[in-house]
């Protein structure tokens, strides 16, 4: 997955966003559709109010896809 794959997820109006409390820094996880219609899970953090640093991007699991589609 590339940065280009992850960017559309942030514009998906149906995206699900949760805070990830398992790390020392404030991290977030967003699940949404990319430009190809794939459901991706993107972990990220804010470096300042206008800068998002993507930590990882991956395809959603079967259970995660189901969760996204149910909302």
Each predicted region: which residue ranges?
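Ribonuclease/tRNase effector modules and their secretory precursors
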Residues: 1-71
């Amino acid at each position: 997955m590339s940065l280009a794959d992850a960017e559309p997820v942030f514009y998906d109006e149906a995206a699900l966003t949760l805070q990830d409390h398992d790390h020392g820094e404030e991290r977030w996880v967003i699940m949404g559709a990319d430009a190809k219609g794939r459901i991706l899970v993107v972990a990220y953090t804010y470096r300042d109010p206008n800068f998002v640093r993507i930590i990882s991007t991956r395809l959603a699991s079967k259970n995660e896809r189901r969760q996204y589609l149910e909302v």
